[in-house]
Amino acid sequence: MTLSEQNIDKEELAKFSDLAQDWWNPAGKMKPLHLINPVRLKYIEQQITLKGKHVLDVGCGGGLLSEALAKHGAIVTGVDMSESLIDVAKNHAEQQQLNINYQCQDIEILTKDAQRFDIITCMELLEHVPDPQRMIKNCAALIKPGGKLFFSTINRNFKAYLYTIVGAEYVFNLLPKGTHDYAQFIRPSELTQWAESGGLRLLDITGIHYHPLKNEFDLSRDVSVNYLACFTHE
């Protein structure tokens, strides 16, 4: 499969690859990801027990979520198309003495293998690929019957634009400028429609809210900006 056939935005891939060496710096450019990671883990554990489960972390980056899942007892495979991020993830896991199967691999290739997973996580990735529906379909093909899939992304509305682009990238400098493209944001209704067309059933949608005075994130009923969704394949 050539790069042009893969569900990859080369500019997005290069942008995040350039952040590889700063990935595990909690005060660096990936600080928001460090702040949001405990909330993602909390949400997953509200939906399913991790211990002993086979988990696929799609778009694992430098391994923030993969390591958290492994520390909570999951058997984790992390895939990402960035070689530099996979190298960072492997090195950090080795330092932490964690056994995580990291692969620089296209998820579409994995669908041709026999292995299926109890849990699939695809966090902060859908808004960075050319065809998010195709990504969801591939995730659905890799889940076991009764397994759970978790997606997190950003709603598409004026409030989300103000918070995640104007606020986070330009006013408060929480993220590097150009991290997000508003046109790539995804409404919950769109995510649900794409997932259902891939044979998935929605179990829950929960928002993520940022408290600027506390400088922390938490789960919320408000899905107008960042949100998490849990689906199952029956």
Swiss-Prot record:
Swiss-Prot/TrEMBL keywords: Methyltransferase, S-adenosyl-L-methionine, Transferase, Ubiquinone biosynthesis
EC class of the enzyme, as a word: transferase
CDD domains, per database record: AdoMet_MTases
A GO molecular-function descriptor: polyprenyldihydroxybenzoate methyltransferase activity
EC number: 2.1.1.222, 2.1.1.64
Pathway membership, UniProt: Cofactor biosynthesis; ubiquinone biosynthesis
Residues bound to S-adenosyl-L-methionine: R40, G59, D80, M123
GO BP terms, alphabetized: methylation
Reactions catalysed, as given in the entry: a 3-demethylubiquinol + S-adenosyl-L-methionine = a ubiquinol + S-adenosyl-L-homocysteine + H(+); a 3-(all-trans-polyprenyl)benzene-1,2-diol + S-adenosyl-L-methionine = a 2-methoxy-6-(all-trans-polyprenyl)phenol + S-adenosyl-L-homocysteine + H(+)
NCBIfam families: UbiG (TIGR01983)
Free-text function comment from the UniProt entry: O-methyltransferase that catalyzes the 2 O-methylation steps in the ubiquinone biosynthetic pathway.
Similarity annotation: Belongs to the methyltransferase superfamily. UbiG/COQ3 family.
Protein name: Ubiquinone biosynthesis O-methyltransferase
Organism: Coxiella burnetii (strain RSA 493 / Nine Mile phase I)
Source taxonomy: Bacteria, Pseudomonadati, Pseudomonadota, Gammaproteobacteria, Legionellales
